[in-house]
């Protein structure tokens, strides 16, 4: 079955794996998925990123992060904002602060995929891909 929205698929795989308390999850590899994973790692939501396989069978394995002795997932929610049917673009001033700054909006800009904080520092806007908190 073809996947029309790989970003939503990635977010769903991460959300499902963290709810089941898996230590890692595999997602189909793409440049966009790898960029989003790097932002998640930089912001402290995942532990590590490993690329496996070659060509169209390549995958990205993400190490999921948990806190406390009950292993509560660090990622509480992931919401897709800009969808294939309705793209959402924001300028620097319009970039949202997720949960008053506790969460992260992942933004695709002309200078690459980055968090909303980094985009504000650089003074650029872009397509708001998702919210993570």
Swiss-Prot record:
Q: What does this protein do?
A: One of the primary rRNA binding proteins, it binds directly to 16S rRNA central domain where it helps coordinate assembly of the platform of the 30S subunit.
**Assembly notes:** Part of the 30S ribosomal subunit. Contacts proteins S5 and S12.
* HAMAP family in the record: Ribosomal_uS8_B (MF_01302_B)
Protein name (Swiss-Prot/TrEMBL): Small ribosomal subunit protein uS8
Lineage from the top down?
A: Bacteria, Bacillati, Cyanobacteriota, Cyanophyceae, Synechococcales
Entry keyword set? Ribonucleoprotein, Ribosomal protein, RNA-binding, rRNA-binding
What is the species listed in this Swiss-Prot or TrEMBL entry?
Prochlorococcus marinus subsp. pastoris (strain CCMP1986 / NIES-2087 / MED4)
Does the keyword section mention NADP? no
What family name appears in the similarity comment?
Belongs to the universal ribosomal protein uS8 family.
Please indicate if the UniProt record lists rRNA-binding as a keyword.
Answer: yes
Q: Name one GO biological process term.
A: translation
């Amino acid at each position: 079955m073809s996947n029309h929205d790989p970003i939503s698929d990635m977010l769903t795989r991460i959300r499902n794996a963290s709810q089941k308390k898996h230590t890692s999850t595999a997602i189909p590899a793409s440049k966009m998925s790898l960029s989003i994973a790097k932002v998640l790692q930089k912001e402290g939501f995942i532990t590590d990123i490993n690329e496996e396989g070659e060509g169209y069978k390549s995958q990205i394995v993400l190490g999921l992060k948990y806190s406390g002795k009950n292993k509560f997932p660090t990622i509480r929610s992931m919401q897709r904002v800009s969808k294939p049917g309705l793209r959402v673009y924001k300028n620097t001033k319009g970039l949202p602060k997720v949960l008053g700054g506790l969460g992260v909006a992942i933004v695709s800009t002309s200078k690459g995929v980055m968090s909303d904080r980094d985009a504000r520092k650089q003074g650029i806007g872009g397509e708001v891909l998702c919210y993570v908190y």
